[in-house]
Regions:
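Short gly/ser/thr-rich secondary-structure transition/capping motifs
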Residues: 161-166, 243-249
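Acidic, amphipathic alpha-helical patches
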Residues: 86, 234, 252
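Short, intrinsically disordered, charge-balanced linker/junction segments flanking boundaries
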Residues: 1-6, 245, 249-252
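Beta1-alpha1 glycine-rich phosphate/pyrophosphate-binding loop at the start
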Residues: 181-248
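Flavin-dependent oxidoreductase catalytic cores
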Residues: 1-182, 186, 190-202, 210
Length: 252
């Protein structure tokens, strides 16, 4: 954490440094902790513990590996961890475990698909915080909330069913219809996906030559690879489900 720098005043660092964290880790171990789940974040720098798309992959790994040297209990790292980096660090003994959470919000079958070598089928988390943070009703301390309210902390922008199963769920129809969808962006493709799973026949009309809509431009920055992964996933879903897509077709 850094204090605000005001013009003509000396700039100073504030917050816990690594030396203090080394002592704190040993103190917690001596106090009886069974495991340490570590990251660089604080309440004032939450984005280290819950990295958005702007943060690099494995952004906490080096510091957590360092902390492990000072304790004998298991040490776990989370925060935009990749499976390869986690597996390599654990195999080398520099880490005892890795934490993954948002992956399961976006796709509850995430790790099952990894084990079955079906990674192309995984609906990716796009690290947007629009569901798991912005849609929640968090008031500061979960214990001060009704359980029914705090449950909303686990929503997901790319998975409408997550923690809203009584509201958003896919049920087979007894009255199949042909549904014409104007626009092949993310919304159009999601509508087509759900309609197909329900037993309807959607037809997408897209005036350009490619599916994606404005999400193509929105995902164009170099650091937004996860957004491009979501586009790839949706396009693949359209092919897998056999959705009829009419490109270069404008509906007036």
């Amino acid at each position: 954490q850094r204090q605000m720098c005001i013009r003509d005043r000396e700039y100073v660092e504030a917050g816990r440094d690594m030396a203090e964290s080394e002592i704190a880790a040993k103190f917690l171990q001596d106090a009886g902790y069974d495991m340490l789940n570590c990251d660089n974040g604080t309440y004032d720098a939450w984005y280290w513990a819950h990295p958005p798309v702007y943060m690099p992959e494995n952004c906490n790994l080096a510091e957590v590996e360092h902390i492990k040297k000072f304790v004998d209990i298991p040490v776990v790292c989370a925060g935009r961890m990749t499976l390869d980096a986690a597996a390599e660090a654990i195999a080398a003994g520099r880490l005892d475990g890795a934490g993954f959470a948002r992956n399961f919000l976006a796709d509850p079958e995430w790790f099952t698909k990894v084990l079955e070598d079906r990674e192309d089928d995984i609906r990716p988390c796009i690290l947007c915080h629009n569901g798991c943070f912005n849609m929640c009703h968090y008031k500061g301390v979960p214990n001060d909330q009704d359980l029914s309210d705090s449950l909303h902390l686990a929503r997901c922008a790319v998975n409408a069913e997550m923690m809203q199963w009584d509201k958003h769920y896919i049920k087979k129809t007894n009255d199949p219809k042909t549904v014409h969808i104007v626009g092949g962006g993310i919304g159009g493709m999601e509508a087509a996906r759900v309609l197909t799973l329900r037993g309807h026949k959607p037809i997408i009309y897209e005036k350009s030559g490619v599916l994606g809509g404005t999400f193509i431009a929105a995902s164009s920055e170099s650091y937004k690879g996860k957004l491009r992964d979501l586009l790839t996933w949706y396009r693949r879903e359209m092919e897998k489900l056999g959705v009829e897509v009419r490109l270069n077709t404008e509906v007036k």
